[in-house]
């Protein structure tokens, strides 16, 4: 018996919608110890994340490591990066959240330019991951600018994967102004987060967000490896590149509607992603069937239980 075309069409549509609804979207978040000590990162926000990254390690040019410890607040809080991880691990006990180390800054350009240093760096990272029972590493090296820097960074990524093997979760964080790592490096990582934000207000409109995502997809980053990053902070509209936490706007009583994307704070106009914008950007990532979402960061948002929380809006759109 022949099945009418309309019925076939609707069957395909239902299957597509079902797959769309069932996709398990990944949620990656950064944890900053200084803000953790100040009580600015809610335990429920940590527990709602699939991936928690601690940006506490800096590479030296020879591949050795230095670590940034959190500062106490009002004589309270953890004082070492190891204790920060232990405390957060207790916060998320009973969840499937992965805890990973994040490497940023330092003398990374000199390190990745040297073959021996790349190997030393990767081995040191693996040792730290093992000693602290961590789930992996995120590289947030800002930013490769020249062809040589992209090549060196890509070689460092390949060396990291070679040393780590498949035991650890390995990601890199890139930006629309700096994303052209090699195809081999793209294949080597588990996922790539794209920082669709910055100190410049041009990054905030939905149109720019969508075009940046399409740009890196066209370059060759697979959609199933791409995690879209959104900001939980605002920047000055005049391009002076000042930043301020969304939390501050709420605390000052400046947020009056989910549709709001501008606020005048201490005499200056800031642009930011309000709740409706976060919802729209999250929905776009889902429509594009990306791996998931990332934010910068939990400390600049409201607690998850607050109805004005941007993270809460993101999770609602993801079906959490």
Briefly describe each language-model feature range:
Residues 28-34, 62-79, 142-253:
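Substrate-binding surface in catalytic domains of secreted glycosidases
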Residues 22-127, 204-210:
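Glycan-recognition patch characteristic of GH18 chitinases/ENGases
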Residues 81-89, 122-129, 154-161, 206-214, ...:
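Generic structural signal for well-ordered alpha-helices
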Residues 52, 101, 139, 192, ...:
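Conserved, mostly hydrophobic/aromatic
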Residues 1-8:
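Bacterial N-terminal signal peptides that target proteins for export
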Residues 12-21:
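Hydrophobic h-region of N-terminal signal peptides that target proteins for export
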Residues 105, 124-150, 180, 195-198, ...:
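Active-site groove signature of glycoside hydrolases
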Residues 48, 68, 223-286, 304, ...:
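Glycan-binding loop/region signatures in secreted carbohydrate-active enzymes
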């Amino acid at each position: 018996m022949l099945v009418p075309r309309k019925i076939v069409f609707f069957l395909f549509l239902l299957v597509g919608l079902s797959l769309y609804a069932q996709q398990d979207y990944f949620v990656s978040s950064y944890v900053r110890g200084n803000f953790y000590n100040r009580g600015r990162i809610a335990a429920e926000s940590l527990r709602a994340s699939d991936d928690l990254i601690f940006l506490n390690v800096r590479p030296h040019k020879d591949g050795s490591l230095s670590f940034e410890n959190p500062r106490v607040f009002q004589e309270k809080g953890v004082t070492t990066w190891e204790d920060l991880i232990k405390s957060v691990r207790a916060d998320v006990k009973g969840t499937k959240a992965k805890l990973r180390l994040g490497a940023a800054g330092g003398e990374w350009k000199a390190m990745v330019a040297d073959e021996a240093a790349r190997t030393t760096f990767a081995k040191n990272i693996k040792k730290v991951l093992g000693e602290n029972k961590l789930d992996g590493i995120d590289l947030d090296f800002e930013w490769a600018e020249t062809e040589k820097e992209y090549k060196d960074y890509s070689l460092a990524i390949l060396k990291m994967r070679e040393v780590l093997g498949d035991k650890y979760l390995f990601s890199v964080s890139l930006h629309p102004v700096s994303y052209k790592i090699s195809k081999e490096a793209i294949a080597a990582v588990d996922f790539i987060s794209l920082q669709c934000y910055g100190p410049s207000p041009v990054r905030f409109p939905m149109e720019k967000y969508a075009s940046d995502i399409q740009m890196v997809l066209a370059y060759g980053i697979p959609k199933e490896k791409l995690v879209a990053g959104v900001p939980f902070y605002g920047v000055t509209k005049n391009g002076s590149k000042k930043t301020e936490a969304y939390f501050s706007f709420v605390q000052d009583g400046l947020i009056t509607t989910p549709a709001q994307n501008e606020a005048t704070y201490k005499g200056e106009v800031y642009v930011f992603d309000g709740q409706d914008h976060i919802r729209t950007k999250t929905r776009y990532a889902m429509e594009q069937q990306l791996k998931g979402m990332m934010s910068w960061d939990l400390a600049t948002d409201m607690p998850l239980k607050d109805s004005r929380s941007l993270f809460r809006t993101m999770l609602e759109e993801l079906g959490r």
